[in-house]
Amino acid sequence: LLPGENLTIQLNYLAKIPSDRFTGIGYSAKKMNLKNWFLSPARYENHAFTKNSNANLEDIANALSSFEVSLKVPLNYAVTTDLIATKKESDSNATSYFLSGNNRTDFSLFVEEKSSFTNYKSDLIDIHTNLKDNAIDPIQKAIIIDRIVHFAKNEIGLYPHTKITVAQS
């Protein structure tokens, strides 16, 4: 593969998801919090693959990738993600979700019996969060989130995707 060229590879595989007992990421009795659970190419810079220590889940050195995920969950379960839902189908037992995202290094995916997330829409981005703070009401929280989004845009630039998840692990 020469510089500037690209290649499409499609992989179908089963992933073994760990318990969330130690890191908060994985599965528990009635929910899953999935982050960095998929195969992804390493970033290639300066004629070498970027290495990372894998000492922390947050230090992964992925290359930009496009993702297509199909997921089938029981009817009473909710799915929250920062990917785009391109299609959703239900039958008498389950709901199938078809999700996609382009030019991403990672994504988050939450499957819960009852969603713990609240959606806040800004003029710039949709924020899905399950952070709890009983000291402020939902309207105040929406105003604060909108101010943070605009501050971040002015200081570091526009977030490159239309949705973001902020989760309490």
Model-inferred region functions:
Residues 74, 113, 128-132:
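Helix N-cap / beta->alpha transition motif
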Residues 1-2, 73, 103, 133:
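Short, flexible loop/turn elements at secondary-structure junctions
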Residues 69, 118-169:
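Juxtacatalytic substrate-recognition/specificity segment
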Residues 107-121:
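Extended Gly/Ser/Thr-rich low-complexity repeat segments
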Residues 2-3, 62-63, 90-91, 121, ...:
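Extracellular/periplasmic catalytic domains that process cell-envelope and extracellular macromolecules
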Residues 9-110:
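Extended, low-hydrophobicity, Ser/Thr/Pro/Gly-biased non-transmembrane segments
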Residues 1-10:
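Intrinsically disordered, low-complexity Pro/Gly/Ser/Thr-rich segments with frequent PxxP/GP/PP motifs
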